[in-house]
Regions:
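Active-site beta-strand termini and strand-to-loop segments that position acidic
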Residues: 40-45, 101-104, 114
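Short acidic/glycine-enriched loop/turn segments that link adjacent beta-strands
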Residues: 34-37, 58, 93-97
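N-terminal beta-strand motif that seeds the catalytic metal site of vicinal oxygen chelate
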Residues: 1-19, 62-64, 112-134
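Vicinal oxygen chelate
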Residues: 13-16, 64-108
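Short, charged/polar surface micro-motifs in flexible loops or helix N-caps
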Residues: 44-48, 55-57, 70-72
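Core segments of cupin and vicinal oxygen chelate
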Residues: 2-3, 9-48
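Conserved beta-strand in the GNAT
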Residues: 48-51, 100, 109-112
Length: 137
């Protein structure tokens, strides 16, 4: 059974700029840095990795979604650091507050916070799923 995601690794064509970008948003460097070919940032119990890529190697589109303590505070931090999110934070119909930001290599990042109702719903679904497994035993 899959238990979770340990890490996401993104390619970068300009490593120093990419490392500065993530540091400015508050990511903690665990290994590597601007001059390393591989850098790992801690994201609580998971990791975001950057790996240097040759210019001719292009990546396809993708999105990484990070849950954060305060969506609006991180949005303000991004603006203060000189970055320009696509739009201001908003409340989504699926129960999250979020905003998107494109990193220096074109990767789309989403910074979100689930609402209590969504968190409660997921906990209830997990409990019900566990109970149904007990009934089958």
């Amino acid at each position: 059974m899959i238990e979770g995601i340990s890490a996401v690794t993104l390619g970068t064509h300009e490593k120093p700029r990419a490392v500065r970008f993530y540091r400015a948003l508050g990511f903690e460097v665990l290994h590597g840095g601007e001059e390393s070919s591989f850098t790992s940032f801690r994201a609580r119990t998971s990791y975001l990795n950057l790996i240097a890529q040759p210019v001719e190697r292009r990546s396809s589109w993708g999105r990484v979604i990070f849950y954060v303590a305060d969506v609006d505070a991180l949005y303000d931090r991004a603006l203060t650091a000189g970055y320009h999110p696509a739009a201001a934070p908003r409340d989504a119909e699926w129960g999250e507050r979020f905003f998107h930001l494109i990193d220096p290599d074109g990767h789309e990042l989403s910074f979100a916070r689930p609402s209590l109702s969504v968190s409660a719903r997921y906990q209830l679904e997990a409990t019900c799923h566990s109970m149904s497994r007990w009934e089958r035993v």
